[in-house]
Amino acid sequence: MSHASREYVTFFPYSNNKSCEEKNVRIMTATDITVKTLKTVSNDDAAYLASLVRTVPGFPNPSIIFRDFLPIFSNARSSRILIDSLIDALPVPADSIDLIAGLEARGFLFGPLLASRLGKGFLAIRKAGKLPPPVITESYMLEYGQASIEIESDATKPGQRVLIVDDLIATGGTAKAAANIVKRAQGIVAGFSFVIELTGISGMSELCDYPCSSLITMPA
């Protein structure tokens, strides 16, 4: 199954913040970031949303460029734009989704909001050790070791169609593990919805069996 088609428009953000630059934090430039063209979200709103995403080099270790999207939730306008955009960009029709599953931790910030707007339930995919038994556990490899995620063993009903959401896709390892755990719980993976897609990495290709969408693309 192929990805949902994605068209993007490059934009210039409102302004750079000198105080942020002095702290080794910068707001995106036009060569860094593109935003998906949407029918119901204006280019101005899309540009405003993306301008709130920060880049923090060297965090949490020197080899990482951290993409911080938490400022999007700092006001009602940007939160509304985010949910409107995610709904507009859904990779599958809303009526083909039964549950929204969010990955810990940042998928918990907007996953329930999206689920509420769509009239769906929410499934929390948690880091290992956070849920009482019985649970289903799925382990996967990271660049620096192994990690595990868990869901409650009765979190889905057989045949329920689950849209998995997260703030960012990089290598795709966590997302693929999320798909595996949903299937092990007898759910059906309806697709994936991401806020940010890092380019230059094979993340989306790891999910080529599922419809996928992302709102913002930027280099890894």
What are these regions (language model features)?
Residues 96-104:
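Short glycine-rich phosphate-binding loop at a beta-alpha junction
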Residues 109-118:
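Short Gly/Thr/Asp-enriched flexible loops that form oxyanion-binding sites at enzyme active sites
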Residues 120-163:
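Short, glycine/charge-rich flexible loops or terminal/linker lids adjacent to PRPP-binding catalytic cores
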Residues 167, 172:
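Conserved G/P- and acidic residue-centered "switch" motifs that form tight phosphate/ATP-binding loops
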